[in-house]
């Protein structure tokens, strides 16, 4: 009689590469260090797990024990698809970025960096931990979302979250409907096609800062545009392509969060309803697919 085939015992599931997180990300999240600072600490053998020093580029489970200089780094809650809490308890602030502020932490050419601008409101220590969700160039102003939790920055800034960036733009001459149609249809820029989701003149009920409503500029010089991504100087380049250089640019909305009555330099925690809308957007966002591994040649 033929010998019956034996089935191999089921193998225990080991964490896949996509389940694991780079150790420098975990160290940055738990310690408040920048990603570069975490890399420096790891390279100096100051970070350990289970009694051994971790290596640069190593990946660990999100709850793996970590110590920095012998002190335990407590694990923080991470977003969970099962719980639907994509923000994972992270605090998110709405801030009116003034003109002249560079949204980086260190820039030899910056007049005012992000931490310097936030120190009067948050204190130097907390201001140094704040990260911007997306960016606004130095000469632009308006709504910028901020958080201390690095893990939520990329999901909220990525175009697949579907969070519109809304702007009020001032130009020397009035933008006509034919030009708005060009913005909505799409324009080829140096880095590819770009288009406005919405482009039109401003309305009486648009959420605009008080100094815009009562300013010296003719209301006809202002227009409203929303886009679905945050490429470098994208709005300015779109207006430049229709021969209407932007004189002043104010971001008035980011997804469900509005600039509202904030004045330059002011910040507030986002409301519970804004938070829920951001969470819904992240839950609904298509998840990135893991890249297939190419077969090894034989």
Residue ranges and their predicted role:
Residues 2-4:
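BZIP DNA-binding basic region
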Residues 6-298:
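Basic, flexible Lys/Arg- and Gly-enriched helix-loop patches that mediate nucleic-acid binding at interfaces
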């Amino acid at each position: 009689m033929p010998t019956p085939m034996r089935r191999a015992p089921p193998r225990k599931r080991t964490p896949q590469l996509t389940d694991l997180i780079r150790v420098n990300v975990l160290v940055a999240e738990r310690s408040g260090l920048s990603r570069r600072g975490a890399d420096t600490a790891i390279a100096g053998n100051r970070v350990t797990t289970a009694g051994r020093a971790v290596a640069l580029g190593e990946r660990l489970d999100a709850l793996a024990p970590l110590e920095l200089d012998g002190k335990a780094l407590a694990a923080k809650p991470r977003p969970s698809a099962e719980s639907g809490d994509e923000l994972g308890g992270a605090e998110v602030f709405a801030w009116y970025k003034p003109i002249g502020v560079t949204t980086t932490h260190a820039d030899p050419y910056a007049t005012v960096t992000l931490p310097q601008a936030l120190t009067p409101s948050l204190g130097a220590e907390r201001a140094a931990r704040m990260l911007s969700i997306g960016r606004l160039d130095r000469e632009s102003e308006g709504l910028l979302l901020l958080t201390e939790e690095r893990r939520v920055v990329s999901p909220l800034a990525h175009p697949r979250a579907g969070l519109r960036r809304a702007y009020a733009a001032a130009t020397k001459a009035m933008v006509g409907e034919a030009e708005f149609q060009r913005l909505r249809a799409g324009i080829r820029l140096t880095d590819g096609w770009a288009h406005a989701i919405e482009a039109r003149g401003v309305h009486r009920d648009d959420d605009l800062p008080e100094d815009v409503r009562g300013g010296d500029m003719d209301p006809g010089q202002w227009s409203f545009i929303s886009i679905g991504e945050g490429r470098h100087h994208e709005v300015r380049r779109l207006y430049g392509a229709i021969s209407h250089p932007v004189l002043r640019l104010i971001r008035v909305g980011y997804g469900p969060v509005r600039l509202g009555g904030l004045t330059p330099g002011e910040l507030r925690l986002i409301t519970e309803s804004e938070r829920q809308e951001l969470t819904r957007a992240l839950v609904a966002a298509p998840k990135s697919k893991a890249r297939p591994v190419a077969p090894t040649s034989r």
